[in-house]
Amino acid sequence: MYNEALFYQSNLIYKEKNMDINFSKEDIAFRDEVRDWLANDYPKHVKEKTDAGITISKEDLIDFHKALSKKGWMGYNWPVEYGGTGWSASKLYIFNKELGLAGCPPILPFGVGMVGPVIYTFGNDEQKERFLPDILNFDTWWCQGYSEPGSGSDLA
């Protein structure tokens, strides 16, 4: 009896705090567009490997990112004025959820998620023109290096 009461109480608390998400018609149409892209334009050789649990190669990862770029979705978290999608939070959620459900490889975060936003926020026009298109086209790879204190090139 005590366990049943706890279960009931915890469900009430959860339900009160659970967010009710109702997608707009525009969001549902976008979800369908993402699903269509996954069915028709997601590189088949990459999908076959990820579906089979086979590690993808660097070339596979490039093909996946290039396909996103061709669709104009590489800048999924960027403002429109810098070549991004300008998507709403619900579209970002749908995009990430559908790619995850399809078993897509992760989008490499360094260029599009870290370096690009710093450049379009703080860079001058020359830097924006030079670097942003290559990030969106996945023509340049970016990374961030770390080292431990006292063992070589300490970043601190």
Which ranges hold each PLM region?
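Short, contiguous pre-domain boundary segments
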Residues: 19-22, 46-48
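Short helix-onset patch at the extreme N-terminus, typifying the N->h transition
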Residues: 7, 23-28
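Short, Lys/Arg-enriched N-terminal segments with co-localized hydrophobic residues
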Residues: 7-18
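Glycine-rich flavin
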Residues: 44-156
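N-terminal glycine-rich anion-binding loops that anchor highly charged ligand groups
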Residues: 36-40, 68-69
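A non-catalytic, amphipathic alpha-helix used as a structural packing/dimerization or gating element
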Residues: 26-37
